[in-house]
Amino acid sequence: MTKKPGGPGKNRAINMLKRGLPRVFPLVGVKRVVMSLLDGRGPVRFVLALITFFKFTALAPTKALLGRWKAVEKSVAMKHLTSFKRELGTLIDAVNKRGRKQNKRGGNEGSIMWLASLAVVIACAGAMKLSNFQGKLLMTINNTDIADVIVIPTSKGENRCWVRAIDVGYMCEDTITYECPKLTMGNDPEDVDCWCDNQEVYVQYGRCTRTRHSKRSRRSVSVQTHGESSLVNKKEAWLDSTKATRYLMKTENWIIRNPGYAFLAAVLGWMLGSNNGQRVVFTILLLLVAPAYSFNCLGMGNRDFIEGASGATWVDLVLEGDSCLTIMANDKPTLDVRMINIEASQLAEVRSYCYHASVTDISTVARCPTTGEAHNEKRADSSYVCKQGFTDRGWGNGCGLFGKGSIDTCAKFSCTSKAIGRTIQPENIKYEVGIFVHGTTTSENHGNYSAQVGASQAAKFTVTPNAPSITLKLGDYGEVTLDCEPRSGLNTEAFYVMTVGSKSFLVHREWFHDLALPWTSPSSTAWRNRELLMEFEGAHATKQSVVALGSQEGGLHQALAGAIVVEYSSSVKLTSGHLKCRLKMDKLALKGTTYGMCTEKFSFAKNPADTGHGTVVIELSYSGSDGSCKIPIVSVASLNDMTPVGRLVTVNPFVATSSANSKVLVEMEPPFGDSYIVVGRGDKQINHHWHKAGSTLGKAFSTTLKGAQRLAALGDTAWDFGSIGGVFNSIGKAVHQVFGGAFRTLFGGMSWITQGLMGALLLWMGVNARDRSIALAFLATGGVLVFLATNVHADTGCAIDITRKEMRCGSGIFVHNDVEAWVDRYKYLPETPRSLAKIVHKAHKEGVCGVRSVTRLEHQMWEAVRDELNVLLKENAVDLSVVVNKPVGRYRSAPKRLSMTQEKFEMGWKAWGKSILFAPELANSTFVVDGPETKECPDEHRAWNSMQIEDFGFGITSTRVWLKIREESTDECDGAIIGTAVKGHVAVHSDLSYWIESRYNDTWKLERAVFGEVKSCTWPETHTLWGDDVEESELIIPHTIAGPKSKHNRREGYKTQNQGPWDENGIVLDFDYCPGTKVTITEDCGKRGPSVRTTTDSGKLITDWCCRSCSLPPLRFRTENGCWYGMEIRPVRHDETTLVRSQVDAFNGEMVDPFSAGPSGDVSGHPGGPSQEVDGQIDHSCGFGGPTCADAWGHHLH
């Protein structure tokens, strides 16, 4: 039973049934309502009204209110705001009507209004300032002035102005000035945020805020990437993240192109691992390492060992950045010569780029239509950047006519941060070198330069171009003299040092000059191209804002990926370069040779340690006090046989002091494998077992590899330790170990027959071996040898054996034998025929009608892939066929280039199989390769030199050479197949078609040249010997047909043979008499002209020849069609109509023969005639003294 409430509750103090509303103070209720609206709660209309209130009062709304504003739907918001607009219009009409009634009353009311306005002006005087600009009134305001109407008293009455700009801040350097136009009654403002009702004025305000930086453009400058540096460098490049991706791509290509090696690497990796995880890891590591040793794999160690012959008095060194040479010679102390530092000082500033700018003092002058062109007076100031334009004007922005009005905006540009480029002068490069003697050194003093200098065991010196020679005193060890040839290895004209912020980089000159940033020169303060860091925003009726771009430092750092980082303060430390020195050792002497042997016991103070260079350092403690005495130390293979093996790096080690427990460091080089280090004599003898990993053959292989790298890297200063006058009895030994390439290291020197027989023997032994591990090892090694014996494999880079007249690129070989026969085992292939077909199609659409091959190997490549290309074109519905014609004469150049594309054509298996058996039909349009020039496909519409070597692969009978499309346009020949060398008195420039040989006999002169074909590219300077200050008119083989710009390409009495028989086949240039002819030197001889064959059209021999000032024996060309003489040698009294002349002119169209004085049949080698005869003498002095020039230009290590 329930009881109804009510009865008992009547007498309570508070009746729960009749409780009314709580009593709240009215102001508290209002506060609650307003606070809920500020928090974004409440009816939409109230929220919008509150936001409008904040907008009109220039107050900042709360975040919650803004959040509610953003959440309101568009249709709802538009409905309420439209009603607000109607209400505002009603209020405006009411005010206008009220104003007219008040004016009729007159009297004191007008005076009262004027006083009120004056009071407002006085109240605003502390914030607003008045001045003049462009002949009109200028008011300077701040952000507190825009909340109310600004009243300015004028002679015409009060001028009321309204400013509704949203970018008004506090005053600072970032100001903006523009016109507030006068609007007549009843016109609404249009495209203006400031207007007045009486007369136009200018407004100025600052745009700075307390909470954030100035407004800046979102745009950024596009800076082209720098790319990888071409310098051989010891340090990592900046942000070099692209190499990992490129290396993975190269690994993939290597696996595809060398499946045999990849299979063997996978088998070896699988055999090495004991579980599946290890097998996968080992296989991946082997596949990643393998291509590093098949392409671009040659590395440089930072320490070389040089052993001199007995009685040697001097030795040639090549010091590289951060490298160290250890020199050992009989009866001489061992020396360490170390390149400590390469430094360039007094850098000249070239150009400064601004990468962070600021924009201040913006002013805009506007004019109405038909009132003339706007002109901003600040245009006269060079520190301002101005821009003129046109805007829409009319009644809503102060103009009586509608139309385009002129506007002129100026802004002051100033640079906040700049990047400075500096150039290095070769004469300001200095080299700091240290020499250290392997003497008696304790572990405390090892590496302590000051202590070693105090003991006369070390010295430092600086080499500069002005002071290349120095003599160092080494105390009891005598003295050494160094004569150096400073060559930085850095082309200072091609690189700049660029400083960005706190970092400095070595950048390419062309990249630096092409930067799209404002720049200035050292002699000027004006910035050029300032518009690149400024943005003129869209112009309004009378206002145009200008903003600066943000700092471009991040973009510059990103673009500099691949550049070399250097340290720069007042000088720059270089990490690329080398120094060639001759070290004279005749005054060096061993110390302690007369000391007796130590008789007390030695102990190992520390366990012997591996230096990482194949040597071991032993720290010995001597208990005796009978010093000074020599240390009996030796390395032996067995304790039962004390025959010394290995050698001491520290020659004649001794204990220098008589104090007990003195410590001495000794360095020695043990043999590969197991050995014992024995110290002491008799029962006081101690020993330590040592194992040195590696092999003698592997060491020799790595040494040869290192020499080949120096040949490629140093160019005309390539050198060879085995070619310096018999000073060395062994080549320079790089002691860093070579991982990978083990098979070629052990068996690469054998013939393929020996490799095959040995492989078969090992396979047989593996099959018959009982032990599983031995059997697998024999089978794997035998299989590798059989594979090597049946495949030609290669590394990139070419080496020359001058004695055998042999050039080797990888393991493929290119031989120039004694009977002048060229034998090549190379085969050019495109990267993929599918992509090449698409490239051909794209080029044909762009107006390229064909190509000119650079060499005969490229021509053969086009012949080999022609049918496959045509099938691809046909399968993809392209009405185009590739036609390969036989080349005529030399391989000519053409102006256009093929361009790369990522697209490829597709072809099915059926079409591919059909292409092997049948050639496709000829299409209506053709793409012509080589052949004679025709009207349908002239040379000016052909492409040339569009491909370069990407990689070397393998093949059964030939080395495969893979080509890719060049990324840049160049006339240079491909350097991947070029080798240059100087050895003894012979210098050679060679590639797969040229063998140009020069000899030293009193002077260097061209001796002979053999041409497989004649091409039209230019020989690269990076592979040119002695190319300083060479005049092209003296080059016998013209520069335009790949003649090296070298002083080796000269001979006394002869000038450039631009009209030689270069269109002939099988050309051999040498200096001798053509069979059955004689040449005499006489002043009455004819003038220089095109080369003439010694037989006429009918085969009659011309026996008598002459020249004016040539040297004998004469220059001749031997070709398949007969013997020709050089341009200086002319026939004596012969019918001109029967002569066979060369029709070639190897100069390009803009050049003329500098020795020509008449028509082609009467061309003189003497421009001034007989009275001004030119004898053709050439200065052959190399500046290093007679026959030693060969050493100055480097040597070849094959």
Swiss-Prot record:
GO terms for molecular function: protein dimerization activity; structural molecule activity. It comes from Japanese encephalitis virus (strain SA(v)) (JEV). GO terms for cellular component: extracellular region; host cell endoplasmic reticulum membrane; membrane; viral capsid; viral envelope; virion membrane. Genome polyprotein: Specific enzymatic cleavages in vivo yield mature proteins. Cleavages in the lumen of endoplasmic reticulum are performed by host signal peptidase, whereas cleavages in the cytoplasmic side are performed by serine protease NS3. Signal cleavage at the 2K-4B site requires a prior NS3 protease-mediated cleavage at the 4A-2K site. Disulfide bonds join C297-C324, C354-C410, C354-C415, C368-C399, C386-C410, C386-C415, C484-C581, C598-C629, C798-C809, C849-C937, C973-C1017, C1074-C1123, C1085-C1106, C1107-C1110. Glycans are attached at N142, N448, N924, N1001. It comes from the Viruses. One of its GO terms (biological process) is fusion of virus membrane with host endosome membrane. The transmembrane domains of the small envelope protein M and envelope protein E contain an endoplasmic reticulum retention signal. The keyword Calcium does not apply. This is Structural polyprotein. InterPro entries: Env_glycoprot_M_flavivir (IPR000069), Env_glycoprot_M_sf_flavivir (IPR038302), Flav_gly_cen_dom_subdom1 (IPR013755), Flavi_capsidC (IPR001122), Flavi_capsidC_sf (IPR037172), Flavi_E_Ig-like (IPR027287), Flavi_E_Stem/Anchor_dom (IPR026470), Flavi_E_Stem/Anchor_dom_sf (IPR038345). The chain crosses the membrane at residues 110-130, 254-274, 280-294, 747-767, 774-794. Residues 37-72 are annotated as: Hydrophobic. Residues 392-405 are annotated as: Fusion peptide. The record marks R105, G106, A127, M128, R219, S220, S294, F295, A794, D795 as: Cleavage. SUPFAM superfamilies: E set domains, Flavivirus capsid protein C, Viral glycoprotein, central and dimerisation domains. Residues 106-127 form a propeptide. Residues 2-15 are annotated as: Interaction with host EXOC1. Keywords: Capsid protein, Clathrin-mediated endocytosis of virus by host, Cleavage on pair of basic residues, Disulfide bond, Fusion of virus membrane with host endosomal membrane, Fusion of virus membrane with host membrane, Glycoprotein, Host endoplasmic reticulum, Host membrane, Host-virus interaction, Membrane, Secreted, Transmembrane, Transmembrane helix, Viral attachment to host cell, Viral envelope protein, Viral penetration into host cytoplasm, Virion, Virus endocytosis by host, Virus entry into host cell. Residues 1152-1177 are annotated as: Disordered. Gene3D superfamilies: 1.10.10.930, 1.20.1280.260, 2.60.40.350, Flavivirus envelope glycoprotein M-like (1.10.8.970), Flavivirus polyprotein propeptide domain (2.60.260.50), Tick-borne Encephalitis virus Glycoprotein, domain 1 (2.60.98.10), Viral Envelope Glycoprotein, domain 2 (3.30.67.10), Viral Envelope Glycoprotein, domain 3 (3.30.387.10).
